[in-house]
């Protein structure tokens, strides 16, 4: 089939697939080449909707190539900043170690005497693995009506579902690992205080040079409204707040605001609520395992294409959890 041949040629162009799919989904302007790709893709999808045939599973191949390119090859600035990133084979495993601390004790002793032994702790850490899977259907009617937009929407949303799950798991795991001590800064209220934010920034600046604060936009906005905070803002910072409603830095540390309107498929926020996280340098490693596999079944009786995205696997090792601190709100 000529259309299938053209689609396969398009799939060989790195980075093109998702750009076109995302622009079609979010109604962004296409250039001449992208319009041609969208037209070819549209004819391909409508033909599948008419015939109920896709013997080479080109929809699954399209989704698989696109999502793999975006998930495994495209940079993710925030996760790249707080984790050492890597990848291993589907059937491989890995391990890590915490930084060795000097816990040897020099005791006062009589000449020629003996003292209590002290030891160096060399702890081996195994990753915590997560495996995510997405399943859904596209109806033949939808393929005939909307053509390529049906597949573009599905592809874009599958990619976002995977990325959102990865981000949520990363911050949730670090959150669960910190239960007390100076890493936990509790505020007896619903908004951050100057004292709490100062404690967080001091903790981070004592431990790293490339630090970041991560929180929901509503708390990034609340930081600016803290009593007595305005006196610490430069004119440029005040202009930024008046324009965007958010602060971009606190005590020299970048503030990454996460939209509260953006949620996972099950309705959860992208990070736990009532939290302001701080990370000094890196908190550990994040390894992607293998690659995604996408399968499809043609269900002509119910006029649907069943799509299964499987094996989105990744593992965390929190080798430097001491570089993580959080402010908790009521």
Predicted regions and their residues:
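N-terminal alpha-helical "arm" segments
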Residues: 1-55
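Alpha-helix boundary/N-cap detector
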Residues: 2, 28, 32-35, 50, ...
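Charge-rich, solvent-exposed alpha-helical interaction surfaces
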Residues: 6, 40-43, 62, 199, ...
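Sequence/fold signature of self-assembling virion shell proteins
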Residues: 34-38, 42-48, 229-330
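Assembly/oligomerization interface modules of large self-assembling protein complexes
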Residues: 52-132
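Alpha-helical scaffold segments that mediate packing/assembly in large oligomeric complexes
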Residues: 131-207
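Extended, solvent-exposed, turn-rich assembly/linker loops in the middle of proteins
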Residues: 176-248
């Amino acid at each position: 089939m000529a259309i299938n041949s053209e689609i396969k040629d398009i799939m060989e162009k790195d980075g093109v697939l998702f750009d076109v799919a995302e622009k079609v989904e979010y109604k962004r302007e296409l250039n001449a080449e992208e319009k041609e790709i969208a037209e070819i893709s549209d004819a391909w999808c409508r033909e599948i909707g008419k015939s109920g045939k896709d013997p080479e599973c080109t929809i699954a191949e399209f989704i698989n190539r696109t999502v793999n390119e975006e998930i495994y090859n495209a940079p993710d600035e925030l996760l790249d900043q707080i984790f050492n990133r890597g990848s291993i084979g589907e059937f491989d495993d890995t391990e890590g170690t915490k930084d060795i601390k000097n816990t040897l004790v020099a005791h006062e002793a009589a000449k020629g005497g003996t003292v209590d032994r002290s030891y160096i702790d060399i702890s081996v850490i195994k990753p915590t693995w997560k495996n995510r899977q997405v399943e859904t259907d596209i109806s033949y009617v939808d393929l005939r009506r909307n053509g390529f937009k049906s597949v573009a929407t599905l592809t874009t949303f599958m990619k976002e579902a995977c990325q959102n799950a990865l981000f949520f798991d990363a911050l949730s795991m670090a959150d669960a690992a910190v239960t007390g001590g100076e890493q936990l800064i509790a505020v007896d209220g619903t908004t951050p205080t100057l004292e709490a934010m100062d404690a967080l920034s001091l903790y981070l600046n004592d431990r790293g040079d490339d630090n970041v604060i991560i929180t929901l936009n509503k708390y990034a906005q609340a930081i600016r409204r803290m009593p007595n905070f305005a006196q610490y803002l430069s004119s440029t910072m005040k202009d930024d707040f008046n324009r965007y409603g958010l602060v971009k830095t606190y005590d020299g540390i970048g503030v990454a605001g996460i939209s509260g309107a953006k949620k996972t498929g099950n309705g959860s926020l992208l990070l736990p609520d009532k939290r302001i996280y701080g990370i000094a340098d890196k908190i550990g490693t994040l390894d992607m395992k293998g690659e995604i596999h996408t399968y499809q079944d043609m269900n002509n009786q119910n006029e649907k294409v069943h799509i299964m995205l499987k094996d989105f696997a990744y593992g965390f090792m929190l080798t430097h959890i001491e570089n993580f601190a959080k402010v908790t709100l009521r």
